[in-house]
A protein has these predicted regions:
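Secondary-structure boundary elements
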Residues: 3, 11-12, 18-90, 98, ...
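Hydrophobic/aromatic-rich core segments of domains that either
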Residues: 62, 94-166
């Protein structure tokens, strides 16, 4: 697989003002089955209020990586982002859901991406988030297992309920 993607440093990217967002991105601001972003607005303001745009996404990514432990088998098909934050453990799907949730609570469109990530050991399918910054979608892996430059995107949706996770 050859991946040809321009990868930008997330922290250097600007958010797009909600009223200037392309119409097809607006749905990715809404709460969804696994990402109850409306329940995180106070938390996001308190924890990440001094950041905006890509700096906020980088801070969220780092917070998730530092505060949530990757534990195989620690979640089920019913685990939401809220469950993951409370339990402080999850798998790649859960890490993606938390990042999506916190981005949406920040008025930054975010979606779930099912991907193939050759850097993941053992090699397997993987789940990451995509955020809409500077007028384009950018892959963000809060687990730190895969770089955006090597990820092959398979499918995207509001959350795992819309995307086959292989």
């Amino acid at each position: 697989i050859d991946v040809n993607r321009r990868v930008s440093e997330i922290a250097s990217l600007d958010a797009v003002a909600p009223h200037l967002l392309p119409g097809n991105t607006v749905r990715y601001l809404m709460p969804s089955r696994y990402c109850p972003s409306d329940e995180f607005q106070s938390f996001v303001s308190a924890e990440f209020g001094k950041f905006s745009g890509g700096e906020r996404i980088a801070a969220i990514r780092d917070w998730i990586h530092d505060k949530i432990e990757y534990v195989s088998g620690s979640s089920t098909g019913q685990t939401t982002a809220l469950d993951t934050v409370v339990q402080r453990q999850g798998i790649c799907r859960d890490f993606a859901h938390v990042l999506i949730c916190l981005a949406r609570a920040s008025a930054i469109p975010a979606r779930f991406a099912s991907v193939y990530a050759p850097d993941v050991t053992p090699q397997d399918f993987h789940a990451v988030a995509e955020v809409f910054l500077d007028g384009a979608w950018h892959l963000v892996d809060a687990t730190g297992m895969a770089g955006a430059d090597s990820i092959a995107r398979i499918g995207v949706g509001l959350d795992a309920a819309e995307v086959a996770f292989l």
